[in-house]
Every structure is written in structure tokens, then in C-alpha cells.
């Protein structure tokens, strides 16, 4: 049986899709909440991973080992880095990077975990499906590009500019995607990140995040709905 894995970090990021699912069965493993059911005619496992890279890595490992999904979509909110994007707009990964990893002293690239790729490539078919879904979610614009992950909420303008200097091509940042991508890489499971902006990094981010998290979660969920409808 083919299953699709959907991963969001927080209650707010998984609530919309959870409400749309049918025949839902909840299972908790090691503190990670899995919601198994049907969505848009597909068998899905919706995972609430918890916030941050360690939580994301642990829960994604459990998802892949216990449920063996065909592919994984990382959903939820992000902080915008691309100046053309606004709160509520969508970002789709073509690559994902750990923006806070630095082992350059041993010859690795900035963001590269030793013996891992410098960036993690999203599955091209899933990226194309996300772009196609965008045509049906008309209230947002989107960018496809590099998404950066770090264990910090990016509300400090100085830190934002430091990260931007290292990765000028970043379209958005968040706190889980590279961990999800790294685990998917090790398992050989295709993935893509489809998130919506809850804030613009460095610009009153905490206030914007609280206010627009629901909007971001809804827009991200609408994208996933259209992706699954198209399959």
C-alpha cells in the first residue's frame, strides 16, 4: 500500500490537513504524533514532528522506518528571505541547506555536514507537482529555490544579514527542513518542502509570526491539497 508522508512541526501547521482527513487513527511513538488516514483519496501519514532539527530528525526517522512512505512533503511556515515575497506567499524547495553548520575548517562547504551533501536536492517530480498546484492556489505567489534550516528563530537583523551573506540565494529559512531532507537522503526517500511565509526574517518577526502563522498554515495546506488532487 502506497502511503504519503506529510510533516509539520507544530499543532497549527498540521491542524488544517488533520481536519480535512478522514478515517483518522492517531498513534504516538517516542512523543511524536502520527495521524494515519485518508486525504484527497490518498493514504497519508501526517506527522507532528516537534520544533527544531533534532525533533525533526527523530520523528522523520520513525516515519520512514515505521510507515515507509513513497515520498515526504514538509509543510508549515517559514521566514522570508527573498525581497519579492510577502507574508502568506509560498516557498518550494529545489535545494535545502543547514545554514548554521560550519565545518569549513576541515575542508567542507559552509552548511555541509561531514560526509553528507552540501545541499539536499528536492525531488524534481515533486517540485513540478508543487509548481502545478500553485496555478490553482491563486491568492499567493511563490518562489522555488534554496531553503535554509537552523536551530534559531531569525528575528535578529544582524544574524539575518550574516546568513544572507553566506547564502545569498536563500528564499526562506525555518527550523526543520534540512533535518527532514538529510534523513530522507539517507533512506533514499524523495522529498520536497512546501511552506508559506508567516514572517519576513528580521522584520518584527515574532509579532508577525504569531499573527500570520494560521494564514501560512492554511496556504501551505491548500498547496498540499492541490498537489494530492493532481496525482
UniProtKB/Swiss-Prot annotation:
Signal peptide residues are none
**Record Pfam families:** PNP_UDP_1
Where on this chain does substrate bind?
79, 154, 175-176
Q: Which GO terms describe its molecular function?
A: adenosylhomocysteine nucleosidase activity; methylthioadenosine nucleosidase activity
Q: Share an example GO biological-process annotation for this protein.
A: nucleoside catabolic process
Catalytic activity entry: S-adenosyl-L-homocysteine + H2O = S-(5-deoxy-D-ribos-5-yl)-L-homocysteine + adenine; S-methyl-5'-thioadenosine + H2O = 5-(methylsulfanyl)-D-ribose + adenine; 5'-deoxyadenosine + H2O = 5-deoxy-D-ribose + adenine
Q: Return the EC number.
A: 3.2.2.9
Q: Which GO terms describe its cellular component?
A: cytosol
Q: In which pathway does it act?
A: Amino-acid biosynthesis; L-methionine biosynthesis via salvage pathway; S-methyl-5-thio-alpha-D-ribose 1-phosphate from S-methyl-5'-thioadenosine (hydrolase route): step 1/2
- Please give the InterPro entries that the UniProt record associates with this protein: MTA_SAH_Nsdase (IPR010049), Nucleoside_phosphorylase_d (IPR000845), Nucleoside_phosphorylase_sf (IPR035994)
Enumerate the active-site residues: 13, 199
UniProtKB keywords: Amino-acid biosynthesis, Hydrolase, Methionine biosynthesis
Q: Which family does it belong to?
A: Belongs to the PNP/UDP phosphorylase family. MtnN subfamily.
The protein's job, in short, is:
Catalyzes the irreversible cleavage of the glycosidic bond in both 5'-methylthioadenosine (MTA) and S-adenosylhomocysteine (SAH/AdoHcy) to adenine and the corresponding thioribose, 5'-methylthioribose and S-ribosylhomocysteine, respectively. Also cleaves 5'-deoxyadenosine, a toxic by-product of radical S-adenosylmethionine (SAM) enzymes, into 5-deoxyribose and adenine.
Do you know which PANTHER family this protein is assigned to? 5'-METHYLTHIOADENOSINE/S-ADENOSYLHOMOCYSTEINE NUCLEOSIDASE, 5'-METHYLTHIOADENOSINE_S-ADENOSYLHOMOCYSTEINE NUCLEOSIDASE
Q: Spell out the protein name for this chain.
A: 5'-methylthioadenosine/S-adenosylhomocysteine nucleosidase
Organism, scientific name? Marinomonas sp. (strain MWYL1)
Q: Which gene encodes it?
A: mtnN
Amino acid at each position: 500500500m502506497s502511503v504519503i508522508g506529510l510533516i509539520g512541526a507544530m499543532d497549527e501547521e498540521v491542524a488544517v490537513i488533520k481536519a480535512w482527513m478522514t478515517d483518522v487513527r492517531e498513534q504516538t511513538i517516542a512523543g511524536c504524533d502520527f495521524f494515519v488516514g485518508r486525504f484527497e483519496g490518498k493514504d497519508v501519514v501526517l506527522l507532528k514532528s516537534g520544533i527544531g532539527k533534532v525533533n525533526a530528525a527523530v520523528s522523520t526517522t520513525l516515519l520512514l522506518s515505521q510507515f515507509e512512505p513513497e515520498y515526504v512533503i514538509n509543510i508549515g511556515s517559514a521566514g522570508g528571505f527573498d525581497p519579492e515575497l510577502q507574508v502568506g506567499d509560498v516557498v518550494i524547495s529545489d535545494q535545502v541547506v543547514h545554514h548554521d553548520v560550519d565545518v569549513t575548517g576541515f575542508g567542507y562547504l559552509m552548511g555541509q555536514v561531514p560526509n553528507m551533501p552540501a545541499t539536499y536536492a528536492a525531488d524534481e517530480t515533486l517540485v513540478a507537482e508543487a509548481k502545478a498546484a500553485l496555478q490553482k492556489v491563486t491568492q499567493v505567489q511563490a518562489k522555488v529555490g534554496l531553503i535554509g534550516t537552523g536551530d534559531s528563530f531569525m528575528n535578529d537583523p544582524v544574524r539575518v544579514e550574516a546568513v544572507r551573506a553566506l547564502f545569498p540565494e536563500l528564499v526562506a529559512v525555518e527550523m526543520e527542513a534540512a533535518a527532514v531532507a538529510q534523513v530522507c537522503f539517507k533512506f533514499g526517500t524523495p522529498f520536497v518542502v512546501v511552506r508559506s511565509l508567516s514572517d519576513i526574517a528580521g522584520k518584527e518577526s515574532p509579532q508577525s509570526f504569531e499573527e500570520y502563522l494560521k494564514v501560512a498554515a492554511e496556504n501551505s495546506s491548500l498547496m498540499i491539497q492541490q498537489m494530492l488532487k493532481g496525482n
